[in-house]
């Protein structure tokens, strides 16, 4: 079976930490796949908030996630603090890619938990149409 392989781009645009909650733990006593999706969403929201943006106002555009891929590497457990590095990938007129490297430290060991990618589309809900990435948002993605 072919596996997803995510190569992280070079443009690092943020670092976020998210602690693992007991609600993130599944019947296997580790973080569930659905919780990883929520952690990635939380990281994106915190990254936007660093610049006073939200998914409803990214320098004037709303954001819609068009796709998501996750490459799981190791289990994560209650008590882990997940360090998420956010990277900017390919940018088009109306959309861009965000990549995420999720890791934690246990003892003195750095552990790669997962890599992920989301496709984000700029959207205007009033006209129900995609719109160009605002200039201020482009500057943030290209820093």
Where are the regions that the model predicts?
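HotDog/MaoC-like acyl-thioester-processing domains
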Residues: 1-15, 72, 76-78, 89-143
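Helix-adjacent hinge/juxtasegments
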Residues: 61-62, 66-87
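Hot-dog-fold acyl-thioester-processing enzymes
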Residues: 2-67, 123-143
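A generic structural signal for ordered secondary structure
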Residues: 20-22, 84-86, 116
């Amino acid at each position: 079976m072919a596996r997803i392989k995510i190569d992280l781009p070079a443009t690092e645009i943020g670092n976020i930490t998210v602690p693992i909650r007991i609600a993130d733990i599944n019947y296997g006593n580790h973080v569930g796949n659905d919780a990883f999706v929520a952690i990635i969403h939380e990281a994106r929201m915190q990254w936007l908030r660093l610049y006073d943006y939200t998914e409803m106002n990214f320098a004037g555009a709303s954001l819609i996630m068009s796709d998501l891929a996750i490459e799981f590497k190791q289990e994560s457990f209650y008590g882990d603090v997940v360090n998420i590095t956010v990277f900017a990938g390919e940018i088009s007129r109306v959309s861009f890619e965000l990549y995420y490297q999720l890791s934690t430290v246990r003892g003195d060991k750095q552990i790669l938990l997962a890599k992920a990618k989301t496709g984000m589309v700029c959207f205007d809900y009033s006209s129900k149409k995609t719109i160009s990435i605002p200039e201020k948002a482009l500057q943030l993605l290209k820093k």
